[in-house]
């Protein structure tokens, strides 16, 4: 089992699909990485040699921000927005949609479960 960027890539999967298990790598980025390293995307993870795995690992470390570093950067960007008090930061702080979506209806995922109305006391 190949381990790249702290992630165990699943055995038996094609290389382009297996790379998407790394946070921050999608299909397009995976194909770019495989093109620059010269690894065939149709091959399985099991078929890769140690040199090819090291080549992919080196490409990721040099040119891409993935996993912990990327998560840290995203959370620090959100924290910065909240600290400066801009509109997007306030929306993050209140747990509401950030990109201008309507909230009168919808936005249940972002707002959380509904609070029920208080019933009439007997």
From Swiss-Prot:
Q: Name the Gene Ontology molecular function terms of this record.
A: rRNA binding; structural constituent of ribosome; tRNA binding
Q: In its keyword annotation, does this UniProt entry include Transmembrane? A: no
**GO BP field:** translation
Entry keyword set: Ribonucleoprotein, Ribosomal protein, RNA-binding, rRNA-binding, tRNA-binding
Region: Disordered, residue numbers: 95-122
Presence of keyword Transcription:
no
What domain of life is recorded for the organism? Bacteria
The family database entries (InterPro entries) matched by this protein are listed as:
Rbsml_uS13_C, Ribosomal_uS13, Ribosomal_uS13-like_H2TH, Ribosomal_uS13_bac-type, Ribosomal_uS13_CS
A Pfam family (short name) is Ribosomal_S13
Q: Quick one: a GO cellular component term?
A: cytosol
* NCBIfam families attached to this UniProt entry: uS13_bact
Q: How does it assemble?
A: Part of the 30S ribosomal subunit. Forms a loose heterodimer with protein S19. Forms two bridges to the 50S subunit in the 70S ribosome.
What is the similarity comment for this entry? Belongs to the universal ribosomal protein uS13 family.
What the protein does comes down to: Located at the top of the head of the 30S subunit, it contacts several helices of the 16S rRNA. In the 70S ribosome it contacts the 23S rRNA (bridge B1a) and protein L5 of the 50S subunit (bridge B1b), connecting the 2 subunits; these bridges are implicated in subunit movement. Contacts the tRNAs in the A and P-sites.
By what name is this protein known?
Small ribosomal subunit protein uS13
Record organism? Desulfovibrio desulfuricans (strain ATCC 27774 / DSM 6949 / MB)
State the encoding gene: rpsM
């Amino acid at each position: 089992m190949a381990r790249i960027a702290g992630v165990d890539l699943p055995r038996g999967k094609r290389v382009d699909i297996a790379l998407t298990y790394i946070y921050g790598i999608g299909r397009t980025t995976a194909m770019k990485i495989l093109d620059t390293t010269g690894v065939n995307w149709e091959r399985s993870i099991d078929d890769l040699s140690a040199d090819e795995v090291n080549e992919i690992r080196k490409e990721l470390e040099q040119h891409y921000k993935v996993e912990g570093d990327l998560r840290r950067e995203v959370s620090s960007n959100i924290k910065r927005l909240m600290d400066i008090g801009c509109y997007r930061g306030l929306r993050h702080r209140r747990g509401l949609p950030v990109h201008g979506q309507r909230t009168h209806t919808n936005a249940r995922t972002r707002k959380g479960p509904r609070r029920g109305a208080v019933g009439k006391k007997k």
